[in-house]
Amino acid sequence: MGSMQATILCIDDEEPGLQVRRMLLESAGYRVVCARSGAEGIKAFQSEPVDAVVLDYWMSGMNGIAVAREIRRLKPDTPIMILSAYGTLLDETLGLADLWLRKGEEEPQYILTKVRELLDNRASKPMPSDPPVIS
């Protein structure tokens, strides 16, 4: 990884899962910001320089879809990974998440690989710039 340390925002209302992902991502050299609710996650997203988001689908209050929708509205190019206990991809998530993983089945190394891929894909995409200035 380059000299810039990527920041990953993890959002989950279940503390054990949140801490496991925090330790996993920090061990790989990422800076991790944790939020314990969708609303807290949105606040953190707005106040921190976040490079990617890993969030739980099923949270009380604001679920993962609502959080992903708001993140897409605020900063459309942010990579989003949604974790869910449910294996089926819901139609409403299409276009909101870059990756959908079934919670509990993924190996920790697999999550790291996928986070790295999301960040690499983002880095290789041309960054959306301001609209061209027509003189």
Walk through the language-model features, giving the residues of each.
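Non-catalytic signal-transmission and effector/linker regions of two-component phosphorelay proteins
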Residues: 1-7, 109-135
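Charged phosphotransfer/docking patches of two-component systems
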Residues: 15-19, 90, 108
